[in-house]
Curated annotation (Swiss-Prot):
It comes from the Eukaryota. This is T-complex protein 1 subunit delta. InterPro entries: Chap_CCT_delta (IPR012717), Chaperone_TCP-1 (IPR017998), Chaperonin_TCP-1_CS (IPR002194), Cpn60/GroEL/TCP-1 (IPR002423), GroEL-like_apical_dom_sf (IPR027409), GROEL-like_equatorial_sf (IPR027413), TCP-1-like_intermed_sf (IPR027410), TCP-1_chaperonin (IPR053374). The lineage of its organism: Eukaryota, Fungi, Dikarya, Ascomycota, Saccharomycotina. Molecular chaperone; assists the folding of proteins upon ATP hydrolysis. Known to play a role, in vitro, in the folding of actin and tubulin.
Length: 529
């Protein structure tokens, strides 16, 4: 009679469960990768997404699509996080990183079926990923930030897969100029928060323009007849209200005769006039007022006094804009009128309201860089909100590509060329290895071919023929041979100016390998109470 096994021990001996859990995890993650696979490359399709609030989005940006998808499986959510990590690190390649993760999980599934331990697979994948990064850096070409043409080509490649691809010759130089105006040859990074993208419906994408300064969507208050243009501006950014104070509790004041009424109005006038004179005394002539939900940020009487004192008033500045405006205008936010002093003001050559395609915007130009940080604004135009949102996302991707080149000044050919080259190198090196590692590296090498295969499929080409042709061209030493959709076949993509920053590819492979390692190490899912 066999010995009795306790319940906990039986669970430990049951080897089926971890395998089933891993299989379920891999299926869930690959389903996410397959869902966005058709949106890769210049001929990739767009997805229409209806959000929970009923808004419509049209995009082929991997991170945008995944962020909006209702994903319930916890492992599938890890792919959304990988896409988000790629978006914050490189800004581009968000679809590629998810497809690559899906392909590596497919390779891992085959290896698990052969009985190879998941930890060995995960660690071998990471070593292969590190080797892939070395190969990519080896085949990249160094560039200088002075070489504007190369930067424009890299930005154009990023825009080629978007709805706005026909405007890439216009938007790519715009993105390059925005980033270069904030950097110099010694810069190692650029903060994209210093580039303000302002969306305005109206006009076409061609009307998108860059402004060397700050653009505000709020209008100048004209109801009291104050100025709408100010040269040699001294700008104050206030967080207090210029209106009569309200009691903390709900109180009623009973007025018996007109003398008391007159006294209340006199008090109010004196209170507001004192605040306005204090502002004028500090030599402030442009006033930005934060939006208030408790009471009027500025009332009609205060506007009348400010217009008489020749002060431009812009009200309803959002709370989340305060930090940006403070940084870019060089002025400190003022929370109390007693703290309103000249040293807290920012300076600019000109503040004016202009009419742009039927909408009014406020431009602040010629900002004096004392303690101000250099910033640029970009007014994004589009026929409707759907086009406008996608234009903004596309422009952000192009800006991220240039930021990648500021961080790591090296370009590689696009169109699947780096993946084929890395795949070939890893496959060759795996033949010299012993044991299980050789198997794992071979599967890793084959998985990398998913990028050129998908590019060819989405372009309507014969993927088997194209990938086979690329392999033979790389074997004969053409390291930059990739897929050109324009030529409907293989070509030297570097000479065709299909370029991408090396950081996009290195980041994608590293993140994909790390994500696969995390997924393979999970052998059970339990739910907490």
């Amino acid at each position: 009679m066999p010995p009795k096994v306790s319940a906990s021990n039986a669970t430990f001996k049951n080897r089926e469960k971890p395998q089933e859990v891993r299989k379920a995890n891999i299926i869930a993650a690959r389903a996410v990768a397959d869902a966005i696979r058709t949106s890769l490359g210049p001929k990739g399709m767009d997805k229409m997404i209806k959000t929970a609030r009923g808004e419509i989005l049209i995009s082929n940006d991997g991170h945008t699509i995944l962020k909006q998808m209702a994903i319930l499986h916890p492992v599938a959510k890890m792919l959304v996080e990988v896409s988000a990590a790629q978006d914050s690190e490189a800004g581009d390649g968000t679809t590629s990183v998810v497809i690559l993760t899906g392909a590596l999980l497919g390779a891992a599934e085959k290896l698990l079926a052969k009985g190879i331990h998941p930890t060995i697979i995960a660690e071998s994948f990471q070593r292969a990923g590190q080797r892939a990064v070395e190969v990519l850096l080896g085949m990249s070409k160094r560039i200088s930030l002075q070489d504007r043409a190369e930067l424009v080509r890299a930005a154009s490649t990023s825009l080629s897969s978007k709805i706005v691809s026909q405007y890439s010759t216009f938007l790519a130089p715009l993105a390059v100029d925005c980033v270069l105006s904030l950097t110099n040859e010694a810069s190692t990074n650029v903060d994209l928060n210093d580039i303000r993208l302002v969306k305005k419906v109206g006009g076409t994408i061609d009307d998108t323009e860059m402004v060397d300064g700050v653009v505000l969507t709020q209008n100048i208050v004209k109801s009291a007849g104050g100025p709408v243009r100010m040269e040699k501006a001294k700008i104050g950014l206030i967080q207090f209200q210029i209106s009569p104070p309200k009691p903390d509790t709900e109180n009623n004041i009973v007025v018996n005769d007109y003398r008391q009424m007159d006294k209340i109005l006199k008090e109010e006038r004196a209170y507001l006039l004192k605040i306005c004179k204090k502002i004028k005394k500090a030599k402030c002539n442009v006033l930005l007022i934060q939006k208030s939900i408790l009471r009027d940020a500025v009332n009609e009487l205060a506007l009348h006094f400010l217009s008489k004192l020749n002060i431009v008033v812009i009200k309803d500045v959002e709370r989340d804009e305060i930090e940006f405006l403070s940084k870019s205008l060089g002025c400190k936010p003022i929370s109390d009128v007693e703290l309103f002093t000249e040293d807290r003001l920012g300076s600019a050559d000109l503040v004016e309201e202009i009419d742009s395609d039927g909408t009014k915007i406020v431009k602040i130009t010629g900002i004096k860089t004392g303690n101000a940080k250099p910033t640029v604004s970009c007014i994004v135009r589009g026929a409707n909100n759907v086009v406008l949102d996608e234009t903004e996302r596309s422009l952000h991707d192009a800006l991220c590509v240039i930021r990648c080149l500021v961080k790591e000044r090296a370009l590689i050919a696009g169109g699947g060329a780096p993946e084929i080259e890395v795949s070939r190198t890893i496959m060759r090196e795996s033949r010299a290895m012993q044991g299980v590692e050789a198997f794992v590296w071979q599967e890793f090498a084959e998985a990398l071919e998913v990028i050129p295969t998908t590019l060819a499929e989405n372009a309507g080409l014969n993927s088997i023929k194209v990938v086979t042709e690329l392999r033979s061209r790389h074997e004969s030493g053409e390291t930059n041979a990739g897929i050109s959709v324009r030529r409907s076949g293989t070509t030297n993509t570097y000479d065709e100016h299909i370029l991408q920053p090396v950081l996009v590819s290195t980041s994608a492979i590293t993140l994909a390998a790390e994500c696969v390692k995390s997924i393979l190490r999970i052998d059970d899912i339990t739910f907490s109470r």
